[in-house]
């Protein structure tokens, strides 16, 4: 999920991506506007399209103006408001013909075939549900950014899976083997103007032990995290407007300049395409990830 858009400020005017000489670099190939605080993108390989969550006017308000759009791999919007009636949907994941999205204090299940909401799973006591990832065993994990925790949907019930200071500002989620990779926003308890940047951790799904994924030095106000296709991860630094890459055990390296408000990215490896919502400018960009 994005670091709350209203606390980030205006986006930069352009997008310039420059990587280190020995690193892969990303190049913008398309840019699509017309969204309403887009927060996350999810690729549906079977349908050949992206789902784009739109938070609407207020990312914390239960105001019913949130929705999900669909978009092609070329950046063209297919359906502006495919699913409506949401509040402020953020991260998404697909499992068993359903699209799951985090919507403030509940996980919403959408039937992909019909485009209708098919279930809602409240997370009583959660503060701000954020990103979502579906595990092969059927469990669905959800980060709670301001609750410093990860929740799990299992047997139709939401419960806290892990809560720990090492999950400070738990945001983006990804899977690597038996570990949940968590990109931490950082400590925003004193307000966003005094935020202490976070770093990436690994949460063992069996023991629930939490360790640093690589360097524990602050990497940024982290948002989305995705496998990079070469054994590491790609990360967005929301406030810094940066695209980062990190290998297990290593430090996060800047591989591209984005805009402040860069949110929950998606990487489609077989297309070499990174897609990033730029929340404040109501824009989604597609980037070619050179190999």
Question: What are the residue ranges of the model-derived segments?
Answer:
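Short loop/turn segments that connect beta-strands within beta-propeller blades
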Residues: 71-75, 111-116, 153-157, 204-208, ...
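Sec/Tat signal peptide C-region and signal peptidase I cleavage site
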Residues: 19-23
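Glycine/small-residue-rich hydrophobic helix-like segments
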Residues: 195-254
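A short loop-to-beta-strand structural motif that recurs across blades of beta-propeller domains
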Residues: 60, 64-69, 106-108, 149-152, ...
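Beta-rich, blade/repeat-based domains predominating
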Residues: 35-47, 58, 64-65, 83-100, ...
């Amino acid at each position: 999920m994005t670091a709350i858009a209203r606390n980030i400020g205006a986006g930069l005017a352009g997008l310039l991506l420059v990587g280190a000489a020995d690193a892969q670099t990303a190049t913008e190939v398309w840019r699509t506007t017309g969204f309403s605080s887009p927060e996350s993108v999810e690729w549906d390989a079977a349908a050949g399209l992206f789902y784009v969550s739109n938070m609407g006017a207020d990312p914390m308000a239960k105001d019913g103006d949130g929705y999900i759009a669909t978009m092609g791999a070329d950046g063209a919007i297919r359906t502006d408001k495919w699913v409506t009636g949401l509040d402020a949907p953020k991260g998404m994941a697909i499992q068993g013909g359903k699209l799951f999205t985090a919507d403030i204090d509940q996980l919403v299940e959408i039937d992909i075939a019909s485009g209708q909401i098919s279930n809602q799973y409240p997370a009583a006591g959660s503060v701000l549900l954020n990103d979502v990832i579906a595990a092969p065993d059927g469990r669905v994990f959800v980060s709670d950014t301001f609750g410093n925790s990860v929740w799990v949907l299992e047997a139709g019930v939401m419960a806290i899976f892990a809560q720990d200071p090492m999950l400070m500002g738990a945001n983006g989620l990804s899977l690597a083997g038996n570990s949940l990779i968590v990109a931490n926003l950082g400590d925003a308890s004193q307000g966003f103007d005094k935020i202490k940047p976070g770093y990436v951790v690994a949460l063992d799904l069996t023991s629930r032990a939490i360790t640093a994924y690589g360097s524990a030095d602050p990497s940024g106000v982290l948002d989305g995290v995705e496998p990079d296709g070469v054994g590491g991860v790609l990360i967005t630094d929301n406030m810094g407007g940066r695209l980062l890459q990190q290998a297990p055990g290593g430090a996060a390296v800047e591989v591209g300049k984005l805009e402040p408000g860069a949110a929950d990215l998606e990487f489609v490896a077989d297309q070499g395409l990174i897609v990033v919502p730029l929340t404040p400018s109501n824009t989604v960009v597609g980037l070619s990830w050179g190999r």
